[in-house]
Amino acid sequence: EVNGVRWNLFNLHLKSKWTERKDDPNANLRREKEARTIRDYLRKRFLPADGHPYLIAGDFNDHKNSAPLRRFLQVNDIALTEMVQCVDSNGHFWTHYYAKQDSYSRLDYLLASPSFFKRMVPESAFIADRHFSLWASDHRMIYADFEF
């Protein structure tokens, strides 16, 4: 609770795309099932019509148009969350560096309920990109400011 506003933060880490096996078709299925299970829990706990503010943050291990991400954005015509567009100081969107394949991807997201999204401070959503950003992890930190 902040300044009398009760809200919830959910942090998640969905199944990785990369496994020890070269071809792991179950990884995609598991990630989608994880997303659906979490989404269903949120829908039961927070009805969209109630307007309860919440934020989902974490490593979704998938691209922004993937089935797991879509599970969190809407059901039929009902918006569940809105994607917070984080960007680094160079205008880049990548949050993960995979050294083995020398590839950059956006796997980490902030998803805000419609009522929480309205509290976001304009132009406050960033991806940390200082020279030491990847020392602690292969993911870069994402963050945004919200007003209460």
Task: For each feature predicted by the language model, list its residue ranges.
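Acidic/histidine-rich helix-loop elements
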Residues: 17-30
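Beta-strand-turn-beta hairpins that frame and shape the catalytic cleft
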Residues: 1-18
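A surface/extracellular/periplasmic glyco- and lipid-processing/surface-interacting theme
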Residues: 3, 31, 55
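Metal-dependent phosphoester-hydrolase catalytic domains
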Residues: 44-55, 61-148
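Beta-strand elements within well-structured catalytic alpha/beta cores of enzymes
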Residues: 9, 55-56
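Active-site metal-binding loops of divalent metal-dependent hydrolases
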Residues: 14, 59-60
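Solvent-exposed, polar/charged alpha-helical surfaces in well-ordered, non-transmembrane soluble domains
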Residues: 33-44, 70
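Loop-centered beta-sheet repeat module
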Residues: 10-12, 29-35
